[in-house]
């Protein structure tokens, strides 16, 4: 069933959240935010840095770039 499958956005955000990979978030107005994603839902992302949390609305996000390469694929051919 299609509803049982996780979409790419959720898989990506969940992976960087669980592994605590630092990310850089670029907003559509050009602002650059850096930190660790601690929580997310359909509408927003909670970003933590230096003990402070920022609630960032997804509609304002242009790009999320992890600080290191990540692999979402867990099959035999994963590199």
Curated annotation (Swiss-Prot):
Keyword set includes RNA-binding: yes
Any one GO MF annotation of this record: RNA binding
GO cellular component: cytosol
SUPFAM superfamilies reported for this sequence: Sm-like ribonucleoproteins
Pfam families cross-referenced by the UniProt entry: Hfq
Lineage: Bacteria, Pseudomonadati, Pseudomonadota, Alphaproteobacteria, Rhodobacterales
Similarity comment: family membership: Belongs to the Hfq family.
Stretches assigned to the Sm domain: 10-70
Subunit structure: Homohexamer.
Name of this chain's protein: RNA-binding protein Hfq
Membrane keyword on record: no
Keywords: RNA-binding, Stress response
GO biological process, one term: regulation of translation, ncRNA-mediated
């Amino acid at each position: 069933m299609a509803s049982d499958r996780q979409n790419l956005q959720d898989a990506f955000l969940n992976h960087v959240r669980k592994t605590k990979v630092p990310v850089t978030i670029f907003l559509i107005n050009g602002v650059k935010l850096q930190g660790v994603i601690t929580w997310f839902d359909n509408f927003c992302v909670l970003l933590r840095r230096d003990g402070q949390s920022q609630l960032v609305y997804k509609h304002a996000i242009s790009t999320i770039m992890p600080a290191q390469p990540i692999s979402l694929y867990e099959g035999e051919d994963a590199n």
